[in-house]
């Protein structure tokens, strides 16, 4: 929806109500026609300003706002505002800077110990990632993981983290230190590639690290149609570990 105008707060609220009502009316009509269907509508709104670069830009940012509608939200409408503009700019930077960030090792892996109160000892660790950007800004996983999940680049980042952890284990092994298993998150998108296990095992062999020292935890992002593939991948990880 596009309108070249400025709106006060009460006008925004009124417009939201109008769009929401149109969405509800449409869903009710579809429910009558297709009783077994489950129709959900999401609407993104961008107000065209004199600074708008093109119609395609307006459509892109309105669609971006639509994609940001929370599945659990009672409101199915999102406005493309200044805050969303900042978020979109950051996401574009996150996508464009990934290759360089990996090459320059800007993604840092830290280890959070798992401590057994009963045995009073460290029984393992969890690998956590932070992005220490060239400008000094530190980004938490919440800032970039979902972006890479959406464009598929999360697979490349997962392998980067995995190899970083394996290299750390190999270094400890060479120095004769006690080893504990380290758990690493991996996207369910790996289930779409039949070579995933081979690629992970190749990294372990490259550094001569025992597979039992690495625990793979698949993130819960798979849809129902992917569940079986994800389960099979998880079973294969367990088999090799």
Task: Indicate residue ranges for each PLM-predicted region.
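Catalytic/regulatory signature loops of cyclic-dinucleotide turnover enzymes
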Residues: 58-81, 97-108, 135
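Catalytic-core segments of nucleotide cyclases and related cyclic-nucleotide turnover enzymes
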Residues: 16, 48-74, 142, 237
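Catalytic strand-loop-helix junctions within cyclic-nucleotide turnover domains
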Residues: 2-13, 34-35, 40-58, 83-86, ...
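Catalytic core of bacterial c-di-GMP phosphodiesterases, primarily the EAL and HD-GYP domains
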Residues: 40, 47, 119-126, 153-230
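Flexible, glycine/charge-rich interdomain/linker segments that couple
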Residues: 39-40, 45-49, 68-93, 110, ...
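Alpha-helical scaffold within the catalytic cores of cyclic-nucleotide enzymes
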Residues: 13-34, 61-63, 161-171
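Catalytic core regions of nucleotide second-messenger enzymes
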Residues: 25-41, 70, 137, 173-180, ...
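Active-site core of bacterial EAL-family cyclic-dinucleotide phosphodiesterase domains
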Residues: 86, 90-147, 185, 217
């Amino acid at each position: 929806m596009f309108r070249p105008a400025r709106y006060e707060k009460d006008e925004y609220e009124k417009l939201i109500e109008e769009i929401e009502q149109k969405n509800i009316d449409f869903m009710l009509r579809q429910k009558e026609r297709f009783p077994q269907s489950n129709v959900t509508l999401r609407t993104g709104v961008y107000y065209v300003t004199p600074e708008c670069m093109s119609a395609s830009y307006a459509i892109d940012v309105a669609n971006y706002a639509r994609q940001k509608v929370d599945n659990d939200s009672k409101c199915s409408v999102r406005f493309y505002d200044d805050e969303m503009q900042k978020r979109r700019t950051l996401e574009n930077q996150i996508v464009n800077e990934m290759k360089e960030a990996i090459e320059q090792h800007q993604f840092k892996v830290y280890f959070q110990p798992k401590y057994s109160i009963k045995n009073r000892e460290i029984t393992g660790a969890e690998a956590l990632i932070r992005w220490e950007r060239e400008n000094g800004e530190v980004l938490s996983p919440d800032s970039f993981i979902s972006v890479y999940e959406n464009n598929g680049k999360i697979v490349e980042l997962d392998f980067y983290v995995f190899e970083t952890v394996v290299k750390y284990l190999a270094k400890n092994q060479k120095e004769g230190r006690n080893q504990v298993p380290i758990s690493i998150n991996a996207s369910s998108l790996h289930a779409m590639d039949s070579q995933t296990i081979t690629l992970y095992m190749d990294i372990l062999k490259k550094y001569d690290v025992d597979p039992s020292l690495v625990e793979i935890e698949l993130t819960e992002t798979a849809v129902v149609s992917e569940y079986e593939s994800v389960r099979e991948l998880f079973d294969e990880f367990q088999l090799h570990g």
